[in-house]
Amino acid sequence: MEQESLNGRYGSRVMTDEQMETLRKQIAIYAVLCDQLVFLHNSLSSVPLLSSGMNPMRGEYFDPMVASSSAHGMSTRPRWTPTTTQLQILENIYKEGSGTPNPRRIKEITMELSEHGQIMEKNVYHWFQNRRARSKRKQPPTTTITSSQADDAAVTTTEERGRCGDDSGGFESYEHILFPSPDLGIEHLLNRDKFID
């Protein structure tokens, strides 16, 4: 009867006392980590950075992961922090070239930058990748209209003006435009181009 009540229908235990204690410790550690992450997020969001990673207050390269991990006593892998001279050289090379340099050129750049501080080839490669991504993120999306598209639009507008009567104020020329129903979602508008082609 006692065996049945422990393992059967009347209150079987899923975890041992040892497992429960381990779970309690894990939950406590998780709570501490969450608190540290909230603190880290708040401290990082209050530091203004330029697009290149420069901290305008101190004029040096700011790496939030290095600054935050040392403040909290967490151990992370060492990260490369370029000197101001290295950053200037990298920015100049980026402005001269187009995109990420080839492996041979990365070796040359690394040799040049090593005169101004520690650096590895992968640091140079990643810097160019990140710099390109930052510049793409900053560019507003551009829509270009070719001259033939502009001419087509002008011809269509002229033809429509000829069809509409003077007494209507020109509103009949817009009857062919289909306005989407407010019930349709954004997906309808995004997929519209697929059906036009």
Swiss-Prot record:
* Gene Ontology molecular function, alphabetical: DNA binding; DNA-binding transcription factor activity
Where is the protein situated, by its record's location annotation? Nucleus
Q: What does this protein do?
A: Potential transcription factor that plays a central role during developmental processes.
Q: Which Pfam families match?
A: Homeodomain
Q: Which residue windows does the record flag with biased composition (Polar residues)? A: 140-150
Q: Which residues bind DNA?
A: 75-139
Family under the similarity heading = Belongs to the WUS homeobox family.
Would the keyword rRNA-binding be found if you checked this record's keyword annotation?
Answer: no
Any one cellular-component term (Gene Ontology): nucleus
Per UniProt, the keywords (alphabetical) are:
Developmental protein, DNA-binding, Homeobox, Nucleus, Transcription, Transcription regulation
| SMART domains xrefs | HOX
Where does the UniProt entry say this protein principally localizes?
nucleus
Identify the domain of life: Eukaryota
The organism that produces this protein has a lineage beginning with: Eukaryota, Viridiplantae, Streptophyta, Embryophyta, Tracheophyta
Name of this protein: Putative WUSCHEL-related homeobox 10
Q: Where is this region: Disordered?
A: 132-168
* Annotated signal peptide: none
